[in-house]
């Protein structure tokens, strides 16, 4: 009899990409797959491009670190989402639920618990996010990317897995990436990206330095939806993308160095590809500090240069990029020491074992 799994997670691409990595492996094993996400989250677009995975949406809310009248309404949206998820899980009868986090995952994990269906949560960041904190007491297993995270969760449920990276990222072709960007190959390539939603601060600082940086680098700029600068279209050596999907492996293969936010999925993908990285984590004022912890961990391991957002200026960005490029060989040697493991297979084994409970 075929096994069935419900996957959930969304809000940002980071809460979806582990699921994207799991889907082909689960299909190879003969699993039926269903996805539960939000009505309008980025997960709907990403999963919608994958054949054979039905998508259902439920109501959800979010945590805002500022006053908003929606903060009073959202708890009721979450309760509505729990009821919707409960009914969907009752109908689909999965053997197990897997969550990658994000606020849409809370109703789904609660719905699984109410139905007596075992669930597995994957926490990417060093410190757990609020959605996972709420959901963890109701989960069967908690898979960790950083071993240090064990101190923040129920140790009896916790399993260190490591970072799950999509196989296709390793299949990039630098020459194909060069053709996409129409670069001539005479300069090293700098790739800058601010996460799936983009980063105005990184975008502004990079563009303010553009003429200086273009003297030394060809630049790929993944700037986020709605953040293309039309005045820079056609600028030699500078290629803008709002968001990339199939193109990303080729662009990463082409890049010599990368400027990035410090979301866990992104930085572990860069680590797996041995890409020297300048990390600019979201500030404490704009987040719960998870990216700062991630960045400091990579800095301590010698994998990354770190520039705090509070210290981000046109001058500091330019100086940090130069330091990164000058020391790229050292960073790559440190990353080689990270060794090889297969977190995806470990995670699959945990999911299969949990489904048998």
UniProtKB/Swiss-Prot annotation:
Keywords: Cell cycle, Cell division, Cell membrane, Cell shape, Cell wall biogenesis/degradation, Glycosyltransferase, Membrane, Peptidoglycan synthesis, Transferase. Signal peptide: none annotated. It comes from the Bacteria. Pathway: Cell wall biogenesis; peptidoglycan biosynthesis. It is a peripheral membrane protein. It is an enzyme of class 2 (transferase). UDP-N-acetyl-alpha-D-glucosamine binds at residues 12-14, 166, 196, 291. It catalyses: di-trans,octa-cis-undecaprenyl diphospho-N-acetyl-alpha-D-muramoyl-L-alanyl-D-glutamyl-meso-2,6-diaminopimeloyl-D-alanyl-D-alanine + UDP-N-acetyl-alpha-D-glucosamine = di-trans,octa-cis-undecaprenyl diphospho-[N-acetyl-alpha-D-glucosaminyl-(1->4)]-N-acetyl-alpha-D-muramoyl-L-alanyl-D-glutamyl-meso-2,6-diaminopimeloyl-D-alanyl-D-alanine + UDP + H(+). Its EC number is 2.4.1.227. GO terms for cellular component: plasma membrane. HAMAP family: MurG. This is UDP-N-acetylglucosamine--N-acetylmuramyl-(pentapeptide) pyrophosphoryl-undecaprenol N-acetylglucosamine transferase. It comes from Geobacillus kaustophilus (strain HTA426). The gene is murG.
């Amino acid at each position: 009899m075929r096994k069935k799994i419900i996957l959930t997670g969304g809000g940002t691409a980071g809460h979806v990409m582990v699921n994207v990595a799991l889907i082909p492996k689960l299909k190879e094993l003969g699993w039926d797959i269903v996805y539960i996400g939000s009505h309008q989250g980025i997960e709907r677009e990403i999963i919608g491009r994958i054949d054979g995975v039905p998508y259902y949406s439920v109501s959800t809310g979010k945590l805002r670190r500022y006053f908003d009248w929606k903060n009073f309404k959202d708890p009721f949206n979450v309760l509505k989402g729990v009821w919707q998820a409960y009914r969907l899980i009752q109908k689909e009868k999965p053997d197990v639920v897997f969550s990658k986090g994000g606020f849409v995952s809370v109703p789904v994990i609660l719905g699984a618990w109410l139905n007596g269906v075992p669930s597995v949560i994957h926490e990417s960041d060093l410190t757990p996010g609020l959605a996972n904190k709420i959901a963890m007491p109701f989960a069967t297993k908690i898979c960790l990317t950083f071993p240090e995270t064990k101190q923040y969760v129920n140790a009896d449920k916790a399993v260190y897995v490591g970072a799950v990276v999509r196989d296709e990222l390793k299949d990039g072709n630098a020459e194909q990436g060069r053709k996409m960007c129409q670069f001539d190959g005479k300069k090293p390539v700098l790739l800058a990206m601010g996460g799936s939603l983009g980063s105005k601060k990184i975008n502004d600082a990079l563009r303010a330095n553009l003429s200086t940086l273009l003297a030394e680098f060809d630049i790929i700029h993944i700037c986020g939806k709605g953040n293309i600068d039309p005045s820079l279209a056609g600028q030699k050596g500078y290629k803008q993308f709002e968001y990339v999907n199939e193109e990303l492996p080729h662009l990463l293969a082409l890049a010599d160095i990368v400027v990035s936010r410090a979301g866990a999925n992104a930085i572990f993908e860069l680590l797996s590809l041995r890409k020297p990285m300048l990390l600019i984590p979201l500030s404490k004022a704009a987040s719960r500090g998870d990216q700062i912890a991630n960045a400091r961990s990579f800095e301590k391991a010698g994998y990354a240069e770190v520039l705090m957002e509070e210290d981000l200026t046109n001058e500091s960005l330019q100086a940090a990029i130069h330091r990164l490029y000058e020391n790229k060989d050292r960073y790559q040697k440190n990353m080689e020491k990270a060794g090889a493991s297969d977190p995806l297979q470990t995670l699959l084994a945990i999911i299969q074992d949990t489904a048998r409970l």
